[in-house]
Swiss-Prot record:
InterPro entries: Peptide_deformylase, Peptide_deformylase_sf. Gene3D superfamilies: Peptide deformylase. Binds 1 Fe(2+) ion. It is an enzyme of class 3 (hydrolase). Transmembrane segments: none annotated. This is Peptide deformylase. The lineage of its organism: Bacteria, Pseudomonadati, Pseudomonadota, Betaproteobacteria, Neisseriales. Its cofactor is Fe(2+).
Length: 167
């Protein structure tokens, strides 16, 4: 397994709309394993392929405290949404930035597992939020882009300042 490089906002590659996965081969299995390793190392709970510059519709997720409930969503699609909730989100592509985002409270998602087998899942709570957040990535949207223009500008300024300090 290998650690992958996580793209950081405002990298334009994060705005790429991912293409469907069509081939379920050993290379895909390796990509999935590498994404889990990268997500765990970065202490994340979800990672979309777009975030590691792999522009296919693939998400890995594990919201458990024990880190033992791996979930893989390939070609995911939200088919139902219900309710509304506000949750403070963070993102591995926007390190150190957290803000409240409005999302559906419950979702139903259709996807394929790592072997290509179709499944449906109804989710609420943190799982529903995480699914929506990661699917945004597959559609080229970063969570901060769901905030007001003023907040987006403040975040960009903060990130630029941080980048200068790290040089």
């Amino acid at each position: 397994m290998a650690l992958l490089n996580i793209l950081h906002y405002p990298d334009e590659r994060l705005h790429t709309v991912a293409k469907p996965v069509e081939v379920f081969d050993a290379a895909l299995q390796q990509q999935i394993d590498d994404m889990f390793e990268t997500m765990y190392e970065a202490k994340g709970i979800g990672l979309a392929a777009t975030q590691v510059d792999y522009h296919r519709r693939l998400v890995v997720m594990d919201i458990s405290e024990e880190r033992d409930e791996r979930r893989v969503f390939i070609n995911p699609e939200i088919v139902e949404k219900d309710g509304e909730t506000v949750y403070e989100e963070g993102c591995l592509s926007v390190p150190g930035i957290y803000d409240k985002v409005t999302r559906a409270e419950r979702v139903k998602v259709k996807a394929q597992d790592r072997d290509g087998k179709p499944f449906e899942l109804e989710a609420d709570g943190l799982l529903a939020i995480c699914i929506q957040h990661e699917l945004d990535h597959l559609n080229g949207v970063v969570f901060v882009e769901r905030l007001s223009q003023m907040k987006q500008q403040r975040i960009k300024t903060k990130l630029k300042k941080r980048e200068k300090q790290n040089m």
